[in-house]
Amino acid sequence: MAHKKGTGSTRNGRDSRAQRLGVKRYGGQVVKAGNILVRQRGTKVYPGNNVGRGSDDTLFALIDGIVTFEYKTRSQKKVSVYPVAAE
């Protein structure tokens, strides 16, 4: 007879990868055209000036410039990119 108990196995121990959503570039940061600004599901933040929207609602910069978060209405946020003034 065995003097040690056999080790059981478990069916747990797996988890799915998180979706990595959220703001990727914050207000005041300098971005290049094509940089992702916000990854989101649905339009939590709307595209403003010089910002494009991908098929999965990802917002990205269309030009080089500075990121600004603004309010479209009282409750709707938008993100815009404004060109850096040449000095």
UniProtKB/Swiss-Prot annotation:
Keywords tagged on the record: Ribonucleoprotein, Ribosomal protein
Q: Which GO terms describe its molecular function?
A: structural constituent of ribosome
Which GO annotations describe the biological process of this protein? translation
Which protein is depicted? Large ribosomal subunit protein bL27
Q: Which GO terms describe its cellular component?
A: cytosolic large ribosomal subunit
Report residue spans for region: Disordered.
1-20
Is the keyword Transmembrane helix assigned to this protein? no
Q: Gene for this protein?
A: rpmA
Source superkingdom: Bacteria
Leader peptide range in chain numbering: none
- What is any Pfam family matched here? Ribosomal_L27
Which family does the record assign? Answer: Belongs to the bacterial ribosomal protein bL27 family.
Q: Tell me the PANTHER family matching this sequence.
A: LARGE RIBOSOMAL SUBUNIT PROTEIN BL27M, RIBOSOMAL PROTEIN L27
| InterPro entries assigned | Ribosomal_bL27 (IPR001684), Ribosomal_bL27_CS (IPR018261)
